[in-house]
Amino acid sequence: MSRVAKAPVTIPAGVEVTLNGQEIAVKGKNGTLKRILNAAVIVTKEENVLKFAPQEGVTGADAQAGTARALVNNMVIGVTTGFERKLVLVGVGYRAQAKGKSVGLALGFSHPIDHELPEGVTAECPTQTEIVLKSADKAMLGQVAADIRAYRSPEPYKGKGVRYSDEVVRTKEAKKK
């Protein structure tokens, strides 16, 4: 059995977990998250604890049990505290502006970029070169951050572009004559 799957997920007060076959719904102060888990995983709920076990005789069930446990744990954390991802814009004239359900970006192209945010993800810009994305769904948050970064990923010579706040960009040395 997976080491990750052996650890049970504790359900904190104020969080409601509903199991319906292979579908799990986690409801908390930050909203409701639903996910369909792999059929090779057996989920049992005992008071305020969720336990995960692989189905016997199914190839890859151990790995799927660990994955399901990690996904459900992220759902519980998401509906209680939420997740956030910070992006930093490095470069002359690179600007960001939060506009309700979208983020306006000026990244040196001939046109401004207006990136629509999916339902459940919010953005704020403390400064013109910083974007803070917040969501209860960790996977969706990571995907939105990656989509915004993909518009202008950091280049290796000057490091200009959109990067994660904790990302270290290794710069190359310029060509010598």
From Swiss-Prot:
InterPro entries: Ribosomal_uL6-like (IPR000702), Ribosomal_uL6-like_a/b-dom_sf (IPR036789), Ribosomal_uL6_a/b-dom (IPR020040), Ribosomal_uL6_bac-type (IPR019906), Ribosomal_uL6_CS (IPR002358)
UniProt subunit comment: Part of the 50S ribosomal subunit.
Coiled coil location: none
Domain of life: Bacteria
GO CC field: cytosolic large ribosomal subunit
Family recorded in the similarity comment: Belongs to the universal ribosomal protein uL6 family.
Name of this protein: Large ribosomal subunit protein uL6
